């Protein structure tokens, strides 16, 4: 992400959610003999944690050489990497900045026709863009695993699109939620905070 023309907050959050889902549904992760399958299963069997890092200049093409899936969306480029233990993060990622990614909110795009995933961030919880993007990725992952199978299949077949639900009152979002993220409390918010929710509008 370059300083001169940064993407907006919402675009990064939506791209992060789509990148996570597309990585998890990639044949290399989803099929029994896929080369990413073991790493994903090990990660999902434990307490899931996601870390958002910012890459600029030559750091971005260096990072893109690592296994993962990149999503370009409304000016944002986000890459979800095959999960590893925190102690095993490749040096190409370890050198990237973690904290301090906080972008301006942009105008939301038009609401797409279903199938798409709606993700709402808790308006009573203050989070940086990096934190919010991680929460959106987690919400999309939970929706992928917990949603009704046929509805999830249609969403994936339609490109796994994601839209932040910024025009729906939070209490109404909570009523619609299929997936709820309660943060582990490692950064920015107390443990157990409800940070994001997701559902598949019909």
Regions found by a protein language model. Name each.
Residues 1-162, 167-174, 183-202:
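Positively charged, small/polar-rich N-terminal and surface patches that mediate targeting and assembly
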Residues 177-178:
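Active-site regions of enzymes building and remodeling cell-envelope glycoconjugates
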């Amino acid at each position: 992400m370059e300083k001169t023309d940064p993407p907006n907050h919402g675009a990064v959050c939506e791209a992060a959610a789509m990148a996570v889902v597309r990585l998890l549904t990639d044949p290399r992760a989803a099929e029994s003999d896929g080369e990413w399958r073991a790493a994903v299963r090990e990660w999902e069997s434990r307490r899931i944690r996601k870390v958002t890092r910012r890459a600029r200049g030559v750091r971005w093409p260096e990072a893109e050489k690592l296994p993962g899936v990149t999503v370009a969306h409304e000016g944002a480029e986000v890459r979800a990497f095959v999960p590893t233990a925190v102690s095993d993060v490749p040096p190409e990622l370890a050198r990237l900045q973690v904290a301090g990614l906080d972008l301006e909110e942009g105008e939301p795009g038009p609401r797409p026709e279903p199938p798409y995933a709606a993700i709402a961030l808790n308006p009573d919880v203050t989070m940086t863009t990096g934190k919010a993007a991680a929460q959106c990725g987690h919400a999309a992952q939970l929706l992928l695993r917990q949603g009704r199978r046929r509805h999830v299949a249609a969403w994936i077949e339609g490109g796994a699109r994601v839209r932040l639900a910024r025009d729906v009152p939070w209490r109404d979002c909570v009523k619609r939620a299929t997936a709820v993220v309660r943060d582990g409390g490692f950064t920015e918010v107390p443990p157990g905070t409800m940070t994001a929710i997701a559902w598949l509008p019909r």
